[in-house]
């Protein structure tokens, strides 16, 4: 009798590399920041007033959306008290920034009153004006296979569905002080990531998915301008993933370096607590200056990072000694 050998098929499947929009956006903003954060695992917490205030508004909007979705009365008294108490904490945490004017000419105190007096009612008013819409997603979580190698995961702030046409409207809540420029609305990568998620979540084709930013502090919404967001964005996403695969981590030096958590000038504690996270290629641009691309050290290659960082730290310590 002949022997039959059965070979089991291997079940070892390589897990997908998980990405969020914020992670791929970090690489797009600055490849070296991506390396420090995600490749080298230097996770630093960097609080700022914009993030704290934005998170608070998101929380209130989420509570209102759940009340509407569940056909429950919206307790504005409770929500306003919560908002006021949290704003007081923010004002105590950022006593200068809370009363400084932003590029819209308003302070956070003024934006607080604006939200309390009018913006807080926007979602309820919107739903009353559009009875054909229902809320189908609130902080809607998702995860999907992007290309067989990478997956995207995250959450969508808010999603509506037109009960007549089946169309999905994705809203991302932004507490921007002023609306975005048109150039920023052409095929935003964030919406491409969300549209691919929406297709799988609600079984709706791309041509029946619309995306827009909801701006409660500007009392408006802004729709993405591209007619085919996913097709326009995929080449960009593929190029970003290719850059990561090829370990192209050359820094992008801009005015945004001023707010970066890896900039030792604006986050000096990392010099002592986590020197391996110091970016030696940061821009010396400051709020009162215009030297956007002045840097202490010019980028050479990855092999020079440790030496450049050591030199950068020694120079900064010398500056501190001279000041003291």
Where are each of the predicted segments found?
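Accessory/regulatory regions of helicases
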Residues: 1-10, 258
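Short amphipathic alpha-helical segments and their helix-coil junctions
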Residues: 11-14, 31-44, 170-176, 238-245
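Nuclease catalytic cores
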Residues: 24-69, 116, 139
């Amino acid at each position: 009798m002949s022997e039959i050998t059965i070979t089991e098929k291997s079940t070892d499947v390589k897990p997908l590399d998980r990405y969020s929009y914020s992670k791929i956006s970090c690489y797009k903003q600055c490849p070296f920041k991506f390396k420090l954060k995600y490749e080298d695992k230097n996770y630093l917490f960097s609080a700022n007033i914009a993030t704290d205030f934005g998170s608070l508004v998101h929380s209130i909007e989420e509570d209102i959306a759940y009340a509407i979705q569940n056909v429950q009365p919206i307790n504005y008294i409770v929500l306003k008290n919560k908002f006021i108490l949290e704003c007081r904490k923010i004002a105590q945490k950022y006593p200068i920034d809370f009363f400084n004017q932003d590029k819209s000419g308003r302070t956070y105190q003024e934006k607080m009153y604006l939200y309390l007096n009018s913006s807080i009612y926007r979602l309820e008013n919107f739903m009353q004006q559009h009875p054909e819409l229902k809320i189908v997603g609130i902080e809607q979580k998702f995860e999907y296979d992007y290309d067989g190698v990478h997956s995207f995961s995250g959450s969508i702030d808010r999603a509506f569905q037109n009960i007549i046409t089946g169309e999905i409207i994705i809203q991302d809540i932004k507490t921007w002080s002023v609306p975005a420029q048109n150039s920023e609305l052409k095929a935003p990568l964030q919406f491409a990531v969300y549209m691919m998620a929406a297709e799988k979540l609600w079984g709706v084709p791309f041509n029946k998915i619309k995306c827009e930013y909801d701006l409660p502090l500007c009392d408006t919404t802004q729709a993405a301008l591209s007619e085919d967001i996913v097709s326009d964005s995929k080449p960009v996403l593929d190029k970003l993933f290719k850059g990561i695969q090829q370990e192209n981590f050359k820094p992008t030096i801009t005015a945004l370096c001023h707010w970066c958590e890896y900039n030792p000038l604006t986050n000096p504690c990392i010099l002592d607590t986590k020197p391996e996270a110091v970016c030696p290629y940061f821009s010396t641009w400051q709020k009162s200056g215009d030297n956007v691309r002045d840097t202490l050290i010019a980028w050479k290659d990855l092999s020079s990072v440790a030496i450049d960082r050591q030199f950068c730290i020694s120079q900064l310590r010398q500056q501190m000694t001279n000041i003291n």
